[in-house]
Amino acid sequence: MSMSTPQKAILPPFNADILPLGLYVAATVLLIGILLLAAWWLGDKKRSAAKEIAYESGVIPTGTARLAYPVPFYLVAIFFIVFDVEAVFIFTWAVAWDELGFPGLIHITAFIIVLLLGLVWLWLKGGLEWGPSKQVRRSKFEVRS
């Protein structure tokens, strides 16, 4: 008789609760693969100049399709993201008010003060002024020639 030591399982025990999720993911990947393969197989393979231009609701495009957006549009997008993230932090703090208590109030107050100081600095630098009425401000330390 030989004595053998029991082998440890390499894989964790099967959890039947994740079986529907696994089947859903497998079916989704299979369906996407079939649809992509069908589109590639059934699609027209001929290239032409008409197929290479962008569709503009039936109007033949003129010039380049790439338009440069003015920088203020990017600034508005960045301001939106910054203040949206700020709102997420403040909302999270408000939801957890019971657990955070007075120290949480001090932290969120410091957070809001830092953001308001940044907003005031941006306003004083002219970052919020754009359009036809925008004027270039000179720093009082700037040397004029």
From Swiss-Prot:
Keywords: Cell inner membrane, Cell membrane, Membrane, NAD, Quinone, Translocase, Transmembrane, Transmembrane helix, Transport, Ubiquinone. Signal peptide: none annotated. The keyword Membrane applies. InterPro entries: NAD(P)H_OxRDtase_bac/plastid, NADH_UbQ/plastoQ_OxRdtase_su3, NDAH_ubi_oxred_su3_sf. It comes from Geotalea uraniireducens (strain Rf4). One of its GO terms (cellular component) is plasma membrane. It is an enzyme of class 7 (translocase). Its main location: membrane. Its EC number is 7.1.1.-. One of its GO terms (molecular function) is NADH:ubiquinone reductase (non-electrogenic) activity. NDH-1 shuttles electrons from NADH, via FMN and iron-sulfur (Fe-S) centers, to quinones in the respiratory chain. The immediate electron acceptor for the enzyme in this species is believed to be ubiquinone. Couples the redox reaction to proton translocation (for every two electrons transferred, four hydrogen ions are translocated across the cytoplasmic membrane), and thus conserves the redox energy in a proton gradient. It is a multi-pass membrane protein. It catalyses: a quinone + NADH + 5 H(+)(in) = a quinol + NAD(+) + 4 H(+)(out). The keyword Hydrolase does not apply. It is found in: Cell inner membrane. This is NADH-quinone oxidoreductase subunit A 1. Belongs to the complex I subunit 3 family. NDH-1 is composed of 14 different subunits. Subunits NuoA, H, J, K, L, M, N constitute the membrane sector of the complex. The chain crosses the membrane at residues 18-38, 71-91, 104-124. It holds the Pfam family Oxidored_q4.
